Amino acid sequence: MTKQINSQQIAIDGPAGSGKSTVAKLVAQRLGFDYLSTGKIFRAFYYLIKENNWSIDQLISNFNKYECAFNGDQVVINKENISQLLNDPTISKGASEIAQDPKIRAYALSLQQDYANKKPVVMDGRDITSVVLPNAILKVFLTASAQQRAIRRIKQLNLELNKATLEQFTNEIQQRDDNDTNRKLAPLMIVKDAIVIDSDQLSIEQVVDKIISLYKQRLGVNYA
């Protein structure tokens, strides 16, 4: 049975630190699509769990009582923008932990797919290409060497780039890659119909241009 391709969905996956969120946001802006950072959904989940001292089951039971808006990488809950709060390392770590739970992953999946079915969208995150948007017209796996991703992360944090710092960050990224690849639920993987883009020698703008070009090719028409 031939699957129905959705021409208004672009899915971008890749390892931690590959720049997929930055790229996805810019691609969406260029195309006039919505952008959704799916990782922010899990961070919002954990934020509510932490604030209310809830279990995962309690979160799922109560989440629809909140007025939540996910707009790109901005998250607003009951008219309060909590986006900056979600960047806290504790929230990030907790989000990664609860994302291993099948129940919360299934709940997030329903929210993500409902969002994607309402409007043209570019999404980035784990299992976007394999589970969340399996019929997306374009699936991209964005990658880069662990060392290059470490350098980018060090610069992003405004830290001094030296041998010790580079070694530390590279080791941490390699460990994260191993964990993500070998975990049982939603492991890091390249689906067979994804286009792999290695950004080691490419600027962000070049990666965005390449994805836009690939999208136009898939669409088969000129896209202004």
Curated annotation (Swiss-Prot):
The reply to whether Kinase figures as a keyword in the UniProt entry is yes
Chief location category = cytoplasm
A GO term from the CC aspect: cytosol
Positions annotated to bind ATP: G14, P15, A16, G17, S18, G19, K20, S21, T22
Biological process, per Gene Ontology: nucleobase-containing small molecule interconversion; pyrimidine nucleotide metabolic process
Keywords of this protein's UniProt record, alphabetized? ATP-binding, Cytoplasm, Kinase, Nucleotide-binding, Transferase
NCBIfam families, alphabetized: cmk (TIGR00017)
The UniProt entry's sequence similarity note says:
Belongs to the cytidylate kinase family. Type 1 subfamily.
Q: Name it.
A: Cytidylate kinase
Q: Which organism is it from?
A: Mycoplasmoides gallisepticum (strain R(low / passage 15 / clone 2))
Which gene is the coding source of this polypeptide chain?
cmk
